[in-house]
Amino acid sequence: MEDKEILAEILTWKGTRWRHMQAVKGEGVDCVQFPVMVAKNLGWVSDDYKTIKYSRDWATHNDFSVLTRELETLLEAVPLSGDVISCTDDLRFGDVLALKMERCVGHLGMYIGNKQIVHVHIRRGVIIEPISLYAKQLHSAWRFKR
């Protein structure tokens, strides 16, 4: 699959509002459901796959990441070298970036090349931002088994 096809699917979610545990394009999605739904639409994940249930604030109160466990079931870890800017050489379109927001990994986004991440902002919905904004939070990268 070409990068432009991956990017096209990711961008169809742009502007969708944040809604906890929702996965409806144009209506509501959260940072966990977003990459899963993109992967389903691209044929990388089975249509019947369901994510685990999770509370909104679990990352604030735990030292382990529910998200990391979920990522390990669907994706392969991508070794990253160097800082957040130089590590983009290791990434491919559609890779999932795990960000440590509190005590553990608590937010996900998708890499779209050009040192940019698409993620679901709680107030602004699905947006594109420079990956450099998350230099301190970048914890790991993951790739769907395609």
Q: Can you name each region flagged by the protein language model?
A:
Residues D83-I85, C104-V105, I127-I128:
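A generic local structural motif
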